[in-house]
């Protein structure tokens, strides 16, 4: 029988890059898939540009986490991240759990 590794107390943190464009969408999806099934914190503090493709990845991931019964939180969102979400019709307070990242 294979031993199940212990689940860490803290959620893994996926740190978003400064530019989330078409080129970043595939790697972002892969990084999120690597932590699927666990609660996850997505650190959006460094985001300067957010494209529709990466927004689509994030929205899909959030829905997947909801379906899996896991928590998907955007933490420390930059003002650029938040304003672009609103501009693209996906205000952060309507589509994501959001909070500041604990030190």
Segments (PLM) and residue ranges:
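STAS-like cytosolic regulatory interaction modules
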Residues: 1-53, 57-103
């Amino acid at each position: 029988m294979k031993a199940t590794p212990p689940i860490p107390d803290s959620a893994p943190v996926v740190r978003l890059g400064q530019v989330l464009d078409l080129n970043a969408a595939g790697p972002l999806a892969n990084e999120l898939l690597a932590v699927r099934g666990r609660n996850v914190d997505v650190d959006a503090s460094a985001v300067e540009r957010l494209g529709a493709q990466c927004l689509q990845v994030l929205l899909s991931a959030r829905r997947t986490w909801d379906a899996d019964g896991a928590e998907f939180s955007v933490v420390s969102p930059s003002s650029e991240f938040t304003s672009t979400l609103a501009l693209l019709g996906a205000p952060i307070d309507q589509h994501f759990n959001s909070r500041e990242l604990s030190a």
